Amino acid sequence: MTTMAAAGLTDAEVAQRIAEGKTNDVPTRAARTVSEIVRANVFTRINAILGVLFVIVLSTGSVINGAFGLLIIANSAIGIIQEIRAKQTLDKLAIVGQAKPTVRRQSGTRAVLPSEVVLDDIIELGPGDQIVVDGEVVEETNLEVDESLLTGEADPIAKDAGDPVMSGSFVVAGSGAYRATKVGREAYAAKLAEEASKFTLVKSELRNGINKILQFITYLLVPAGLLTIYTQLFTTDAGWREAVLRMVGALVPMVPEGLVLMTSIAFAVGVVRLGRRQCLVNELPAIEGLARVDVVCADKTGTLTENGMRVSDLKSLTEGHVADVLAQLASDDARPNASMAAIAEAYQTPPGWSATATAPFKSATKWSGTSYGEHGNWVIGAPDVLLDPASPVAEEAERIGAQGLRVLLLGSSDRSVDAPDAPGVVTPAALVVLEQRIRPDAGDTLDYFASQHVSVKVISGDNAVSVGAVAGKLGLHGETMDARRLPEQPEKLAETLEECTTFGRVRPDQKRAMVHALQSRGHTVAMTGDGVNDVLALKDSDIGVAMGSGSSASRAVAQIVLLDNKFATLPYVVGEGRRVIGNIERVSNLFLTKTVYSVLLAILVGIGGLSAKIFGTDPLLFPFQPIHVTIAAWFTIGIPAFILSLAPNNERAKTGFVRRVMTAALPSGLVVGTATFVSYLVAYQGREATPVEQTQASTAALITLLASSLWVLAVVARPYQWWRVLLVACSMLAYVLIFSIPLAQELFMLDPTNMKVTSVALGIGLAGAALIEVLWWVQGRVLGEERRVWR
């Protein structure tokens, strides 16, 4: 149908609407600004703790003892760089949001930015044009609109004059114009985007667990700090500078500062690896989140199926050149729809006939055709329209269609296709059976999730039969339900979701309700989607996964964006998440062992200092300065932890992170702390000690600490592979070199020259290592865990 051209607004009318604020001001999408990203990564609990201690150390003038302050920069930089990179990528992807509509005004027809559209503007449409605001069609020529990003319905919808069009949809055929009736925040797509516009952080057990540990340590630092300050300043004869440095030396190792850094590095490396697979991660912990998911809600269109269809069968009903006819019809269609494009792909050798008349496809008539003179008049379309619905051929087509397939009838007509009463009498020639093009990797992806005990729910706006057919072909078995029959009550909805696998005719609000219902049953839910209709469900799910070709709103709220639109990338994301979770849990034992022995040492030294004040015994200096605890962490924790955090690890993700790591770290830390304190007491010469003797006592304590801590590393590195053994051996060798090189001894304030003291310290350290080994085997037996030394 063709309608008359509508006049556009005058310049005065446009100016008036701008003055009244009736413009298309699109809501800010759900993403943090650069300043918000910087604030979130700089002003953290651990940076605050380290920052205060760093300033205290600098006040003493000892720069070398402030080396731990570099961690403040590293902790912040990794998170900032990654999030800003993700933000920049998303901004570049927002092409749809920058589509330039063509408006018709008194001053002429011109392309403008979406934000420059005003209420009542006449906006022209052509194939592929984005509809940027809600409106009403005022003129059309065979206009068809794809609203799949809004409704999930894959089939294009014919639009006549007076019909509404919604922002977020686009033109697939024909041309026309519409009048803007709702702009800015009143538009449909903008309302969904605004409802989802508040930024929310992804849930992370690792992040939450580490924050709980840091919170506890923060509370612990106050009494421990006061005790250490008092004993070092008021019970010893050391000057304020020496006392302050040893106080900081007691407090710094209590903070598992490297754990936050190592977690960020492990996540960042995972992000880089996934980036090579065209997977954009908006937030670092999203990798962990997907590894913990036990239900994936997958949108059928664009996730399990590709855009387009394929010919799955051709049922010839008469003798003749059916393939030639199909090839010629497809070749002559200048703007083929999905069905004709599939036929063109299947039949690529047209006979070269000349067309004498054509009839384009219209949704209202549901057929198209071409007349070829002596070669006949050929039509193709819906069987129940071209034939009597009660005819055997139409009934056969209906039976095939009930399997979720699309069926077209190819037939010859007794009159030209441009005749007023066309198509006339149609003689059936063939049934063309089409099916949605299934992604070649979708089946393997679903098999992977099944093997990992992850349930997959297929959700779509298409009819339930079609959705169920696609799921069945992919080996996803289970009951199919039409979402129009879903119960409204959350409890009953949750029960239905547990029983059924595929859902058709799902509304956008139902997708969100389905996510909530699954979460109410304790499930960790991932949601995949690409349209505006998926935005709220993506936002409320535990992990939102958007397609790169989808709407800008869906990409903004999702934690993970698949830039190449491949559902098959998700198993790699799960694998990276498992690597991060398993390895961070492993290296957490190293960092928290240090926290435990540091707290124990501070308490024991504090008690010793109070005893000196009460009973008049020799005062007790804290054994270490900040540089000592810094080098102690280099090769017992820092570098080995970094290497271990990047190692392959495909263990299933489990909950209870804090409980498990503390169960391992607490006994090890107590052993290391006790052994170090005993070694220090043996070597300590009391009030009369010379500076050299005090340095030798500190060195002895450090040797004991290193010997026992290195065995903690040896235990954490199990089960051994050749490179893990080499890692532990190199760590041991590094400390041998540090203690052997005179320049290093002077720089790090070490003196191992008293062989008697050094030998005793080493012996105590080896005894601590032996006890740690025994505890590891005992813990395995008590917890019922298999202990393996070698892989």
Swiss-Prot record:
Phenotype upon gene inactivation: Disruption of the gene leads to impaired growth under Ca(2+)-deficient conditions. Mutant also shows hypersensitivity to polymyxin B, increased biofilm formation and higher cell aggregation, indicating cell envelope defects.
Main localization, broad class: membrane
Positions bound to Mg(2+): D299, T301, D530
Pfam families, per database record: E1-E2_ATPase, Hydrolase
Topology in the lipid bilayer: Multi-pass membrane protein
Transmembrane segments: 53-73, 213-233, 252-272, 596-616, 627-647, 664-684, 697-717, 725-745, 757-777
UniProt KW keywords: ATP-binding, Calcium, Calcium transport, Cell membrane, Ion transport, Magnesium, Membrane, Metal-binding, Nucleotide-binding, Phosphoprotein, Translocase, Transmembrane, Transmembrane helix, Transport
GO CC aspect terms: plasma membrane
Catalytic activity: Ca(2+)(in) + ATP + H2O = Ca(2+)(out) + ADP + phosphate + H(+)
CDD domains linked: P-type_ATPase
Active site: D299
Compartment(s): Cell membrane
Gene Ontology molecular function: ATP binding; ATP hydrolysis activity; metal ion binding; P-type calcium transporter activity
Family per similarity comment: Belongs to the cation transport ATPase (P-type) (TC 3.A.3) family.
Functional description taken from the UniProt entry: P-type ATPase involved in specific uptake of calcium. Essential for growth and maintenance of cell surface integrity under Ca(2+)-deficient conditions.
PANTHER family: CALCIUM-TRANSPORTING ATPASE
Name by which UniProt lists this protein: Calcium-transporting ATPase CtpE
Organism: Mycolicibacterium smegmatis (strain ATCC 700084 / mc(2)155) (Mycobacterium smegmatis)
